[in-house]
Design a protein with these regions (language model features):
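Post-cleavage N-terminal segment of exported redox proteins
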Residues: 1-22, 69, 98-101
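Short hydrophobic/aromatic-rich motifs at helix boundaries and adjacent loops
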Residues: 3, 37-39, 61
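Electrostatic cytochrome c docking/interface patches
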Residues: 13-27, 43, 62-65
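A short linear-motif detector with a strong N-terminal bias
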Residues: 14, 32-36, 55-57
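Amphipathic alpha-helical interaction segments
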Residues: 16, 35-36, 63, 88
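Periplasmic/extracellular electron-transfer cofactor-ligation site
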Residues: 25-51, 74-76, 99-101
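Extracytoplasmic electron-transfer domains, predominantly the class I c-type cytochrome c fold
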Residues: 49-101
Length: 101
């Protein structure tokens, strides 16, 4: 019985990890892409107006710094701590890292 429970728990955890990337992409598309662009380049009309960084090239920040900006905002960017869970923020930081070319 314990073995079955362990196998089941492993499957659940693995499944959660698989959906994490899709969730981060959806969070990015819904909350970030209008300024930062789908690819993180910041070449949208709003991104150019605000002078956002090109995250496909410039990633000179730590994961903790990125999480802090996502949660609390910076400059004209609003914070998302009331909207996103810590797991969402962590997934979003990993997603931003994946945008680097």
């Amino acid at each position: 019985m314990k073995r079955k429970l362990l196998v089941f728990a492993t499957i659940i955890v693995a499944s959660a990890g698989i959906s994490l990337g899709a969730d981060a992409a959806a969070i990015w598309a819904q909350n970030c892409a209008s300024c930062h662009g789908k690819d993180g380049s910041g070449t949208t009309t709003m991104g150019k107006k605000l002078g956002v960084k090109d995250y496909s090239k410039d990633q000179g920040f730590s994961d903790a710094e990125a999480a802090n900006v996502i949660k609390n905002g910076k400059g004209k960017m609003k914070g998302y701590k009331a909207k996103l869970s810590d797991a969402d923020v962590k997934a979003l930081v990993a997603y931003v890292r994946s945008l680097k070319k």
